[in-house]
């Protein structure tokens, strides 16, 4: 194995020991979340009636650009007035009413002035599919922005035939300082709910024969790394002797991806009942899923492999593998012998095996009361002329379930976290994405159109405060 990777993993493992003893976040109570009101910010809704908004970027034209997952629309918004224009609508985007598919990734070329490219990923019909339950594919595509006509043209499919389902699409796309595309693709919801008996592929990588045949089914549960033309970088890691688009493996639903000023890649990832993760992405790293959720600590999670169950009529007890129906093979995290495991920088949240996953406060929507917060993206705050005091080296992580945005402080090298995740902006909203203005004193936040969120009293509501909105939070300097 690469000596550089070994050194990084050793460092992260040492950090994990510190994290477990000092920085392992304890789940907050609803009353604690209710206090996260952030009085030092003025709130203003500048745009509403969006249809499943997903990605949010500050454009090279100093305007806000955002996407609608349901419609395939790419919108440009004036950050002051909220006036909006539809720049383009990606044709033939597939979005199921009950699915996480649609228009997903969105990024500008770093040198947009000389290379006016916009990169997207999305769900499209797969003409080669013979599976009625899985008829779609994910495509990573490049468009050229035409300034004269103010629209997108000349589509080029960089990578087609990627896995797609209704669940765990992830779909965050960023371009790194190395001029490579980084893309998160989830495990497609395998081993749970509608896909309970489908084998999870997060630990699998392609053979050379599969890669040559453009069979990408093992790309589920990965972070991919592509050249800007979609080809495989020569310096990508080798897995079982094969160099593919895969950069890291062992992911569940990594919906957040962001580079730091010093070139490190941070990621937020949704866990099962417990252990949402904040990760530092390391070349060739294995992040454990589905064998490990969070730390390799045998705490609150075990891998129940329903695809190996003989009886395909049994039900998931929704106990995070700690309790399962008879006949389901279960392995503890400590029993997993996978190589190159990279522990998270932080979890939200880790609990013991005795934790009650059936809190009656949430009624039938018990998943809302689970320790997880459902992190939906990640944004590295870079400050500016009006930077918020004390926010240096900060990662912002929106939550879908808790109606907050977490502020996570990291050390100056972005290698470890300093303190607990601090919740802010509590409301009955499902926060989807967040960015800051170039000056650093204004945050812009997208909210989901629909869904469930936990109220201040701990119960569940689907009546959202600002559904499908772009909200402006302006810092009031003391």
From Swiss-Prot:
Subunit structure: Homodimer.
Binding, D-glucose: 100, 167, 192, 252
Biotechnology (record note): Potent biocatalyst for the accurate in vivo monitoring of blood glucose in the management of diabetes.
A matching Pfam family: GSDH
Species whose genome carries this gene: Acinetobacter calcoaceticus
Region of interest (PQQ), residue spans: 252-253, 430-432
Protein name from the UniProt record: Quinoprotein glucose dehydrogenase B
Domain of life, source organism: Bacteria
